[in-house]
Amino acid sequence: MQYSEIMIRYGELSTKGKNRMRFINKLRNNISDVLSIYPQVKVTADRDRAHAYLNGADYTAVAESLKQVFGIQNFSPVYKVEKSVEVLKSAVQEIMRDIYKEGMTFKISSKRSDHNFELDSRELNQTLGGAVFEAIPNVQVQMKSPDINLQVEIREEAAYLSYETIRGAGGLPVGTSGKGMLMLSGGIDSPVAGYLALKRGVDIEAVHFASPPYTSPGALKKAQDLTRKLTKFGGNIQFIEVPFTEIQEEIKAKAPEAYLMTLTRRFMMRITDRIREVRNGLVIINGESLGQVASQTLESMKAINAVTNTPIIRPVVTMDKLEIIDIAQEIDTFDISIQPFEDCCTIFAPDRPKTNPKIKNAEQYEARMDVEGLVERAVAGIMITEITPQAEKDEVDDLIDNLL
């Protein structure tokens, strides 16, 4: 027998009261986006559960994708059969023969939304249990915590059988907590920060700063690939490429070396905040971890934060590097993050960055530059690409292929 659909149960949505259907509709759309790589799969949702109809798609692959989607508590693969007692008896016998191993216990759990069906739930449990005994005479029934709980549901259109429950990712559906702008470099930390924001329902847009010719097409592609890895948790993500060469050259020419990193981060924060305002975001998210590098001190964060009143979320701020790496490996971003392409934060990095920069000094050095003009030109030059779970070969891929 082949699975016909996957029955999906919701996570924290049960606590959302009058907003429940808004959360459910968002989750349905997210599931549809993530499963868009399987065109034949169709997704529906109601107040109690969602259904992914396989229509011939490979169950194992679809299930692996579903495991990542935030907002799902658990799900079960389901067999759809004709709504008749004889067909049901034959189906439970076939299923039990496939999965039963010596010494296992079982029970039948039936329920029906079609109350015109010829047997009630108790009678159906007894009838189907008897069919199992016919197929496997020595099998034992156990009502509490059996090895196999074969669930049977009688609906108006058909009967459905399942025996397996698979844990989902939990969390909230992406997009139900508002939008945030993720400052995405090419490193290990920022994709993990994005992942943790997604888990709490934040719809992220990835802001990446590129400084050609100092940063390569490979660095840009790396950031896009990291973004694509994050789409599996809630669907498509807008990737915003910011031209940053002019600003970095200006900082390099007009500021002392010790303040290069501080000023660079202040400009990045200004630009990200301007993009957030235009695109109706609520927060800025980054991958800073306290004390991990010389520029990520509380004094440095204070100096960088000073250019905006927008809330800054730093999901990994209290984590050790090894904790962050563990998550990066779990979400499959680590191997991409360690590819040897330099990003904006490393190309002009000073040997001894200021660990306790003063806001007054930063403002004094910025007074030598046309800050507003630099920010406006950078924002005017952004390029936005929608990143989907399905990778498409693009010009950067072709360029890298030629270089290799």
Swiss-Prot record:
It comes from the Bacteria. Residues 60-165 form the THUMP domain. Belongs to the ThiI family. It catalyses: [ThiI sulfur-carrier protein]-S-sulfanyl-L-cysteine + a uridine in tRNA + 2 reduced [2Fe-2S]-[ferredoxin] + ATP + H(+) = [ThiI sulfur-carrier protein]-L-cysteine + a 4-thiouridine in tRNA + 2 oxidized [2Fe-2S]-[ferredoxin] + AMP + diphosphate; [ThiS sulfur-carrier protein]-C-terminal Gly-Gly-AMP + S-sulfanyl-L-cysteinyl-[cysteine desulfurase] + AH2 = [ThiS sulfur-carrier protein]-C-terminal-Gly-aminoethanethioate + L-cysteinyl-[cysteine desulfurase] + A + AMP + 2 H(+). This is Probable tRNA sulfurtransferase. Transmembrane segments: none annotated. Keywords: ATP-binding, Cytoplasm, Nucleotide-binding, RNA-binding, Thiamine biosynthesis, Transferase, tRNA-binding. Pfam families: ThiI (PF02568), ThiI_fer (PF22025), THUMP (PF02926). GO terms for molecular function: ATP binding; CCA tRNA nucleotidyltransferase activity; tRNA binding; tRNA-uracil-4 sulfurtransferase activity. Pathway: Cofactor biosynthesis; thiamine diphosphate biosynthesis. ATP binds at residues 183-184, 208-209, 265, 287, 296. One of its GO terms (cellular component) is cytosol. InterPro entries: Rossmann-like_a/b/a_fold, ThiI_AANH, ThiI_fer, ThiI_N, THUMP_dom, THUMP_ThiI, tRNA_STrfase, tRNA_sulfurtransferase_ThiI. Its EC number is 2.8.1.4.
